[in-house]
Amino acid sequence: MFDGARLAQGLPYYISQVVFYPFEIYNSMSIVDVISRQDELDSPKAKPHVNATVFDSWWFDAVSNNLTKESITVVFYNAGPESIGAPDLGGPLFVEISGTFDNGTKFTIGSTAPEGAVIESGTQGIRGDWMGSGCSFTGSDLHRPSPEYTVSIDNAGLGVFGKLTLQSVSPPHFAGGSNKPGVSPELIPNIYAAFAQPDAAAVVDFTINGKTLKFNGVGHHEKNWGTAALEASVKAWYWGHGRVGPYSLVWFDGVTPGGKEYFASLITENGKIVSQSCEPNSVVVRPWGENDEFPPVRGAAAPAGYTLRYALGHGMAFVANFTREVSQVEADTYKRMIGSFSGGMEGGEQYEGRALCDQFQF
């Protein structure tokens, strides 16, 4: 099929790579991409495979638009046993499915991919299959308007069946800039991110152990990878995404074990970029209420919420507030939360919305 849209942008018609990862660790040096390449925003970053300290993952989530407690997060991992702190499952390939039902009840279930993983990616999009897990995902060309991703799960052993569909609201970008070659994806030293869908319209339709999880909401898809153990690279971080009125927001405020703070921020309005930066203090995130210690320490409970302040330059700022309603995941070193979200230009109209965020604390 002739693809005039891509050719008009000076992009190649069709280039694809297919990678197979076995359910075993690579016992040598992994070569990891640390600068963006053409048409590879969502492609695998570790070659030929992950070793013990390298990880490569694809994250998808959604939180209900309504004032309900429904949410879901699905993460496809290719992670060495010393990389993200997860239990050693006998191999690096696994899928984690977490969420909350309307009544606030949370669940976390998962499956390994003992038959390996196949990932095909290129100019037409991406397809990933964690074989033996019943979990897969597809995504369309990120250079086209409103890319769409679908996560499909069919696993009788887990009792999970259904789909998550995400239609982009905001354009793709890296932590350090837009979706083009030569951009740094670094969030914090050794840890990288590519936001294929910073904000998306989500449609969720799952059956989980006989219970229905079905809603429309605010969605997000990003890719994360790292070249060293997470705990060796991060003391704490605050990350999240949300939507208020016409604005879509992504934030990252992280601290290294040495105490240096790193930032990454994005604001779009009706799909157009208002601000994108990884400059110091581009988005300052701080906890409020109980458990407002900064940075948070291992074992501390989740805070009541966060304040966010985006520096836009010329004395302008975008301010937002997240209020935790329910925790999707709780551990000594990690919290994932959903809740209400409000914000707008400082001194201007303030809007209401929804958000999902997480917190590391080592």
Curated annotation (Swiss-Prot):
Recorded superkingdom: Eukaryota
Outcome recorded upon mutating H220A: Completely abolishes the activity
Keyword Metal-binding: yes
Transmembrane region(s): none
EC number, UniProt record: 4.2.1.-
Gene null: resulting phenotype: Abolishes the production of penigequinolone and accumulates the epoxide formed by penE.
Keyword Metal-binding belongs to the record: yes
EC main group: lyase
Catalytic activity: [(1'E)-5'-(3',3'-dimethyloxiran-2'-yl)-3'-hydroxy-3'-methylpent-1'-en-1'-yl]-quinolinone B = yaequinolone D
One GO MF term attached to the UniProt entry: lyase activity
Residues forming the catalytic site: H220, E222
Pathway(s) where this gene product acts: Secondary metabolite biosynthesis; Alkaloid biosynthesis; Mycotoxin biosynthesis
Keywords: Copper, Lyase, Metal-binding
UniProt similarity note: Belongs to the quinolone epoxide rearrangement protein penF family.
UniProt name for this protein: Quinolone epoxide rearrangement protein penF
